[in-house]
Amino acid sequence: MATRVQPSVKVLGASFSQEANPFTAAVELTPMPMLITNPRLPDNPIIFANEAFQNLTGYEADEIIGKNCRFLQGPGTDPKHVEIIHSALEAEQSVEIDILNYKKSGEPFWNRLHISPVKTENGELHHFVSSQLDVTLELGKLVELEKERETLSIEKQRSSDQLQYIVEVANVGFWTRDYTTGEISCSAEYRRIFGLTPDEPVNYDKIIDMVVLEDRITLIQRSQESFATGKSFRVEYRITNRLGQVRWVETRAKALLGKSPALLGIVIDVTERKKAEADKALVTREISHRFKNSMAMVQSIANQTLRNATDPQTANELFSERLRALSQAHDMLLREDWTGTTISQICETALAPFNSTFGHRIRTSGPELVVSDRVTVSLSLGLYELATNAVKYGALSNENGTVQFSWDVLERQGERKFHMRWVEDGGPAVERPTRRGFGQRLLYSVLTGELRAKCDINFAPDGLVIDVLAPMTADVFPQLDSLSDTQAEPV
């Protein structure tokens, strides 16, 4: 909307005649809509309207002459614009303004109105001359442009809000470092990662001091290379933030070169991802280790079985049974996420094949003790072999014999000891074997190698008795620290 008020510079002779005055003739013939009003008459009426004005407004001359210009105003006319015009006329000054007027048809149009006072040589106000220009189309385009600008502004704000939401959800921090001053402008997420307060000033020295020394040189070099080449870079490094937390951070940045060089980038906390990668690597190594151990166990079972078997069929049966026992032991560990198993669970699994026939003759007892995964597999196989031998040669080979397997924790000279006992009773007379079988060799391997135990095997006439006494260490008993003192029986 154009509005301009300025002092008058026009002067007209004292006499004024529409018929004779060349000025009036020029106004009549101009294609610009023109009006002349007489401020010396009440209400400053219109005394002249050219044909162009009549064509613009749709009014005839007799509908115009004698009226005040306000007859063009309507319900949409802004009173503020009317007041601007009135004030200029009162001050005998020129004015230019865009005002909403109405044609005879009721159609509104934007009128670019210019009014100038005409004065005599003595400086007395004689007339007002005004020109009109229909600028509806022009202002309409401006309105459309303004609406488009507002729409773009709204869309820009919406996009900004969406970007901010994405940034918050993605936990990405933004930052800009001034190359000259080292000052850093950063987002809230950036401050969270580095443990900074919301209003705390941030600069390059403060941040670089948080970077772990081993990673600091790499970060500095990559930043310098970016300023030298203008290329972007990506680097992962560790920080010890202001809260004392060690975090893994990933930075992606690019130097903006020019009169005001700066480094613009994002930062992401990748601590959890790094932890997951480390856990994955650990699991991979652990799986490889356990696979090798399992293969070694299978190879040992195969060698021992084939070496002592009397014929291929027997060898195949023994080997299959022992592999089933090994498989059951591994299934048990999988259920416990390879964290170890209680001895009660080991007994239940290893002796399961014998329970249906000899369940009432095989008794187990002892506290809830968890042993490591390595001991779980070996002890399961050992118990399976002892029970198998009891069926073939020992207490379970007749109708009356029994087996008692027990374990407990003893207190000796202020140290905890693990005590385990296998007792066969009521079976045939026992004779010391001329050679060690697979079960006995496996049991010795578990006891002396993995439990670091002292083992006493007694082939008494009434039945086999095995006594084991081992130190209690955390690598064999993972829950040793949580074992209550009440579980230890003084001896």
UniProtKB/Swiss-Prot annotation:
<dbReference type="InterPro" id="IPR011102">
    <property type="entry name" value="Sig_transdc_His_kinase_HWE"/>
</dbReference>
<dbReference type="GO" id="GO:0004673">
    <property type="term" value="F:protein histidine kinase activity"/>
</dbReference>
<dbReference type="Pfam" id="PF13426">
    <property type="entry name" value="PAS_9"/>
</dbReference>
<keyword id="KW-0843">Virulence</keyword>
<dbReference type="GO" id="GO:0005524">
    <property type="term" value="F:ATP binding"/>
</dbReference>
<feature type="modified residue" description="Phosphohistidine; by autocatalysis">
    <location>
        <position position="289"/>
    </location>
</feature>
<feature type="domain" description="PAS 1">
    <location>
        <begin position="19"/>
        <end position="92"/>
    </location>
</feature>
<dbReference type="InterPro" id="IPR000700">
    <property type="entry name" value="PAS-assoc_C"/>
</dbReference>
<keyword id="KW-0716">Sensory transduction</keyword>
<keyword id="KW-0547">Nucleotide-binding</keyword>
<feature type="domain" description="PAS 2">
    <location>
        <begin position="159"/>
        <end position="230"/>
    </location>
</feature>
<dbReference type="InterPro" id="IPR000014">
    <property type="entry name" value="PAS"/>
</dbReference>
<keyword id="KW-0597">Phosphoprotein</keyword>
<keyword id="KW-0677">Repeat</keyword>
<dbReference type="GO" id="GO:0009881">
    <property type="term" value="F:photoreceptor activity"/>
</dbReference>
<feature type="modified residue" description="S-4a-FMN cysteine">
    <location>
        <position position="69"/>
    </location>
</feature>
<keyword id="KW-0418">Kinase</keyword>
<keyword id="KW-0285">Flavoprotein</keyword>
<dbReference type="InterPro" id="IPR036890">
    <property type="entry name" value="HATPase_C_sf"/>
</dbReference>
<dbReference type="Pfam" id="PF07536">
    <property type="entry name" value="HWE_HK"/>
</dbReference>
<keyword id="KW-0600">Photoreceptor protein</keyword>
<protein>
    <recommendedName>
        <fullName>Blue-light-activated histidine kinase</fullName>
        <ecNumber>2.7.13.3</ecNumber>
    </recommendedName>
</protein>
<keyword id="KW-0675">Receptor</keyword>
<dbReference type="InterPro" id="IPR035965">
    <property type="entry name" value="PAS-like_dom_sf"/>
</dbReference>
<dbReference type="InterPro" id="IPR001610">
    <property type="entry name" value="PAC"/>
</dbReference>
<keyword id="KW-0157">Chromophore</keyword>
<keyword id="KW-0288">FMN</keyword>
<dbReference type="Pfam" id="PF08447">
    <property type="entry name" value="PAS_3"/>
</dbReference>
<dbReference type="InterPro" id="IPR013655">
    <property type="entry name" value="PAS_fold_3"/>
</dbReference>
<keyword id="KW-0808">Transferase</keyword>
<feature type="domain" description="PAC">
    <location>
        <begin position="93"/>
        <end position="147"/>
    </location>
</feature>
<keyword id="KW-0067">ATP-binding</keyword>
<comment type="function">
    <text>Photosensitive kinase that is involved in increased bacterial virulence upon exposure to light.</text>
</comment>
<feature type="region of interest" description="HWE histidine kinase domain">
    <location>
        <begin position="286"/>
        <end position="368"/>
    </location>
</feature>
